[in-house]
Amino acid sequence: MTIFDNYEVWFVIGSQHLYGPETLRQVTQHAEHVVNALNTEAKLPCKLVLKPLGTTPDEITAICRDANYDDRCAGLVVWLHTFSPAKMWINGLTMLNKPLLQFHTQFNAALPWDSIDMDFMNLNQTAHGGREFGFIGARMRQQHAVVTGHWQDKQAHERIGSWMRQAVSKQDTRHLKVCRFGDNMREVAVTDGDKVAAQIKFGFSVNTWAVGDLVQVVNSISDGDVNALVDEYESCYTMTPATQIHGKKRQNVLEAARIELGMKRFLEQGGFHAFTTTFEDLHGLKQLPGLAVQRLMQQGYGFAGEGDWKTAALLRIMKVMSTGLQGGTSFMEDYTYHFEKGNDLVLGSHMLEVCPSIAAEEKPILDVQHLGIGGKDDPARLIFNTQTGPAIVASLIDLGDRYRLLVNCIDTVKTPHSLPKLPVANALWKAQPDLPTASEAWILAGGAHHTVFSHALNLNDMRQFAEMHDIEITVIDNDTRLPAFKDALRWNEVYYGFRR
């Protein structure tokens, strides 16, 4: 059972009565065949549900209206099997508030060269029916996704599946509640922002809860529940001597388990799926939540430190998008650099809170070590290195008049040396196209020091996310050149300025 099982995507066929009942009967048969095949063979994350043909303005409007009010409907896939005059779609598309994908396909893959006649031509008109539909989208200034390819093509399946992930993520985001335990880290700019504007743009709500409210729930957790969770720790992780049953830091592990159970109960009771903490506001907690946060992220919760609600929300959104995909997704921070000619590296980490979903080790190390920041007892944490391979880091920032998504494509590498004195999980990567270009572009674009790191998602996923939410995206990859990048920032400023 995954979040995708809670949603479905409606498959809508556009046609008209001009061609007669026999043609419409064949269109319906083709649609049933295609939907059944896609549900069976395409490995789509969501079920496709075939809706009645849209052959009149009233029928199309009814489908779009019903989609809006059906909470299970994540979006619409539209196929213009025959020519479907696009004025019929205006009212429906005007009111539609669910994501829309135009599947530019046709039932047959090859033309029947010896038998093709006008009946065949009239039945299979995607080539120009799709263009008519595209015009009305452009005329109405409504962005929608387009996938071209035969319905049996695996690449088309993958693209539809990727779009479905975005559509479900968007519906989940509309119901997302972000809990901030405490406020923003004092005097920090980029982690702050306009929460009302965010709720208007994305749908998620952000509210603050006193740490004392959390502490009450933490203190209500029974010793039996704590011991049961620590037994789980024993089976899942490599425990250092200090954390084992007679170790000198065993009590810190028990307290970390109590915090995890209390946090999870608080989040579940409030319907929260993302949260933040700050080391400046830990009143009543015996340690900064480290292990608890790591494990909650692995369970799908969004998180960011220092009150950074935008990154916490983005992490949850990306967790939903990547459900079931290979590779993990985590809160991250660009921490420090390794400058070496031709081998510049970024070491990413945070004080404690890196998600084990990106761990290279099957059993991370569970340890308790000193943490000066926060002024509390030594916190428990998981320590691990990160899987190697292509990845991305993404940052969502508030520019006042709009949101900007920054994405840097990176290549994670194996740590060339052991890190015996580094008591936190970490990731090591090469930034594309190189560290000087990537860091300068990131700084010029205003990217945050907090990011979401993902092996599971790629640049195309984030482009789709930006398009679906109608926000700016700024990309730093192997094709980035600083002069052109600066020009793009200037052009974007003008473009979005005109749209205000």
Curated annotation (Swiss-Prot):
Cofactor binding comment, as recorded: Binds 1 Mn(2+) ion per subunit.
Cofactor(s) needed by this chain: Mn(2+)
Catalysed reactions, as listed in the record: beta-L-arabinopyranose = L-ribulose
InterPro entries: Ara_Isoase_C (IPR024664), AraA_central (IPR055390), AraA_N (IPR055389), AraA_N_sf (IPR038583), Fuc/Ara_isomerase_C (IPR004216), Fucose_isomerase_N/cen_sf (IPR009015), Lara_isomerase (IPR003762)
EC number: 5.3.1.4
Keywords associated with the record: Arabinose catabolism, Carbohydrate metabolism, Isomerase, Manganese, Metal-binding
Physiological role: Catalyzes the conversion of L-arabinose to L-ribulose.
Family stated for the protein in its record: Belongs to the arabinose isomerase family.
Protein name: L-arabinose isomerase
SUPFAM superfamilies xref list: FucI/AraA C-terminal domain-like (SSF50443), FucI/AraA N-terminal and middle domains (SSF53743)
Pfam short name (any one): AraA_N
Induction (free text): Induced by arabinose. Transcription is dependent on the transcription factor AraC, the cAMP receptor protein (CRP) and cAMP.
Top EC category: isomerase
Residues annotated as binding Mn(2+): E306, E333, H350, H450
Pathway the protein acts in: Carbohydrate degradation; L-arabinose degradation via L-ribulose; D-xylulose 5-phosphate from L-arabinose (bacterial route): step 1/3
GO BP: arabinose catabolic process; L-arabinose catabolic process to xylulose 5-phosphate
Subunit structure: Homohexamer.
Cross-referenced PANTHER family: L-ARABINOSE ISOMERASE (PTHR38464:SF1)
Native organism taxonomy: Bacteria, Pseudomonadati, Pseudomonadota, Gammaproteobacteria, Enterobacterales
Keyword Isomerase in annotation: yes
GO CC, any one term: cytosol
GO molecular function, one term: manganese ion binding
Keyword Isomerase: yes
